[in-house]
Amino acid sequence: MFSQTEDGQNTLTHIWDYREKLPNTPYTISGHSRAAERTSFYVPELGILFDAGISTYHSPKIVLITHCHSDHCCMLPMVITNWKSSEPFRVIVPFSQKTMFNKYLNSSFQLFTENSHVSVTGCNIEGWEPNMEYNFGKNILIKTYKCDHSVGCLAYGIIEQRNKLKDEYRTFSGKDIALLRKDGVSITNEIYLKQFVYIGDTSIKIFENYPELFEYQAIIVECTYLRNCDEEFAPMHKHIHWKQLVQYIVKYPEVHFMLIHFSMRYKNEEVIDFFNEKRSQLGISNFSPWLN
């Protein structure tokens, strides 16, 4: 499962080769995340890259950047350089950081070319505000949430729009349904399924501010600190400690919590042992650490 060096830390060689099903959803996910090191995840079924702290050979349809800290965005110029489509490359960032991201990308491409007059082309930087919904493709909505971090930061909810047959037509045969459709009868209702939400750097306050987050099938969320002795650092740096998060994991057993962004002070083996112990103590299994 892991690509590791002898000391138990990961190399970057096979990060994108390993893929796992995101529980409770129809999607799979690959990527890597460690606090103050690098974070990036890719969902191939949607063509969405979340954050760009790692270069990738994938050609995503859209990149959703949570915030401007370098471990979440430093490899964005390389991601753009590797873009293989003729379609404009879409990069979403917090609205307050749009101008700075444009400057960063232009400066990067000027360094690549040793030409101070060039600017990045074929790339659309879009600044999104929190608490908004944006259409993506035919049946996906992306909803933004405001994280509580030291800089402007967005979480991204993935919502799937489906058509569900109205109750009064459930007993109808396929032939009768086809005839109704031909006659222009509206036989379905639109429903919206909250598939998963990707929460980058934040304090625990995001769950207090947005109770609707627990309506998602899966929550990808940072859990930077684990040890009791590290508890003070969570509010200090606006991150999350396990002791703050566990109450919600227990309260919402139908939601799967994928935990990311562990501090580099913890080796993989320590993280695995920690959560194995917690599973045994709590008697629940609706959470998993991501350590690829």
PLM feature spans:
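Active-site flanking residues adjacent to catalytic metal/cofactor-binding acidic residues
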Residues: 50-53, 66, 199-200, 221-223, ...
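Active-site regions of enzymes building and remodeling cell-envelope glycoconjugates
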Residues: 60-67, 123-125, 141-143, 280, ...
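Active-site metal-binding motif and surrounding structural segment of the metallo-beta-lactamase
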Residues: 52-96
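Binuclear metal-ion centers of metallo-dependent hydrolases, dominated by the metallo-beta-lactamase
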Residues: 90, 115-135, 206-292
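Active-site-proximal loop/helix segment associated with metal-binding centers of metalloenzymes
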Residues: 135-228
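Conserved beta-strand hairpin/beta-sheet module of binuclear metal-dependent hydrolase folds
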Residues: 2-61, 154-158, 164, 188-199, ...
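Extended recognition/assembly regions associated with phosphoester-bond processing machinery
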Residues: 1-20, 25-39, 128-132, 142, ...
